[in-house]
């Protein structure tokens, strides 16, 4: 999952 508007937020 990656946040749509935050860059380094994938896990």
Swiss-Prot record:
Q: Where in the cell is it found?
A: Secreted
Any one Gene Ontology molecular-function term assigned to this protein's record: toxin activity
What broad class describes the main subcellular location of this protein? Answer: secreted
Disulphide bond pairs: 2-9, 3-10
Domain notes for this protein: The cysteine framework is V (CC-CC).
Family under the similarity heading: Belongs to the conotoxin T superfamily.
Task: State what protein this is by name.
Answer: Conotoxin au5a
What species is this protein from? Conus aulicus
């Amino acid at each position: 999952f990656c946040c749509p508007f935050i860059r380094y937020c994938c896990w």
